[in-house]
Structure formats: C-alpha cells, structure tokens
C-alpha cells in the first residue's frame, strides 16, 4: 500500500474474506467495514494505541451507495483484526463479539492504520469464508467461491465507477 501511495495512489478499495463470528448475521451478506478492532501489531507502528481504527467515511459512503443501488445484500459492521489466528480462543471470541465484531480477519486494522497515517482513503468489503466457533472451526461456507467472485466483480465495478466519476471529492457521506 505504501509503495502504491508513493506513486500517487491515495484511494484504496480492499476486498477479502473473513471468519463469521456473529451467527445471526446472514452469511450471504457482505460486510462493509466501518471500523476494525486492533488486535495485531502493525497498526501500533502507525497510530497511537486505541481499541478501534475507522475506515474511510468517504469511500464507505461510495461503496454503500453502489451496493444499495445495485441490490447487493450487505451490512456496515465492525471486524476484528488479529494476526494470531490460533489464539482465537472462546474467551477472546466472546470479548470481540461484545465489542461489536461480526467477523474476524487479518489485515483491515493494519491497512486502515497505514491509510490514516499516510492520509489515504481506505475501505474494505468482506465476505464470509467460514464460521469461527468457540469450540471448533467450521468447514468453508458453501457460497464462499460464489461470494469471492461476486466481491471481485463489485470491486472492479467500484473502481471503474470511482475513476470515471466527475468529481469524487463531492461524494456525499451517508450515515451507516
């Protein structure tokens, strides 16, 4: 990301998969990340200690409007970023769910912290690959491959729409 930033890129649309924590969340819906719980190491090299790091309101609003307009199922939500996936213990899972996380992944907090530090805009759209349970790991979600292809198409469409927008500085922020 930083290398791309040095070449003048300042808006980052990120997609990826995540383990589902909140089983009430429809697994076929996408997660538009509003904020990430910082439980990894990289973000602390870029920002002062804090529980959360927010993603870009500007890009989130752009993605939100695109997803609504095109009929995709999604929810703005919080993710938990950790770089120690073998330490997703029952106690830590409970704590992160209490703190609002609907899913767990390994990069959002780090990327969002770098973006904030460097003055970039970053948003992340996630799909569920599996369910992280307190006592075991589930198999991969049956829609995983379909959702991965769908999120890749969404990202390509978003970038094209963003680049062809007359003035992306005038993106209207939406309340999520």
Q: What is each residue range found by the language model?
A:
Residues 1-53, 57-61, 117:
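Metabolite-binding pocket within alpha/beta catalytic cores that recognizes anionic/polar moieties
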Residues 10-11, 102, 121:
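Short acidic/polar active-site loop segments enriched in Thr and Asp
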Residues 50-98:
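Active-site rim beta-loop-alpha module in soluble metabolic enzymes
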Residues 52, 56-60, 72, 89, ...:
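Generic structural signal for well-ordered, non-membrane alpha-helical segments
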Residues 62-70, 114, 154-165:
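Generic non-transmembrane alpha-helical segments
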Residues 109-143:
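Zn-dependent metallopeptidase/amidohydrolase metal-coordination segment
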Residues 132-176:
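His/Asp/Glu-rich mid-to-C-terminal helical/loop segments that flank catalytic regions of hydrolases
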């Amino acid at each position: 990301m930083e290398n791309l930033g040095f070449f003048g890129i300042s808006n980052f649309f990120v997609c990826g998969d995540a383990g589902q924590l909140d089983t009430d969340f429809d697994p076929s819906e996408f997660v538009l990340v509003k904020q990430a719980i910082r439980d990894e190491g990289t973000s602390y090299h870029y920002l002062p200690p804090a529980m959360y790091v927010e993603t870009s309101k500007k890009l989130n609003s752009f993605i939100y409007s695109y997803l609504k307009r095109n009929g995709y199922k999604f929810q703005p939500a919080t993710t938990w970023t950790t770089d120690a996936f073998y330490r997703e213990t029952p106690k830590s899972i409970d704590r992160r769910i209490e703190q609002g996380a609907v899913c767990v992944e390994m990069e959002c907090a780090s990327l969002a912290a770098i973006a904030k530090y460097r003055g970039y805009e970053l948003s992340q759209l996630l799909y569920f690959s599996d369910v992280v349970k307190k006592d075991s790991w589930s198999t991969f979600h049956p829609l995983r491959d379909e959702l991965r292809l769908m999120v890749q198409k969404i990202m390509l469409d978003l970038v094209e729409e963003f680049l062809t927008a007359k003035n992306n500085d005038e993106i209207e922020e939406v309340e999520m």
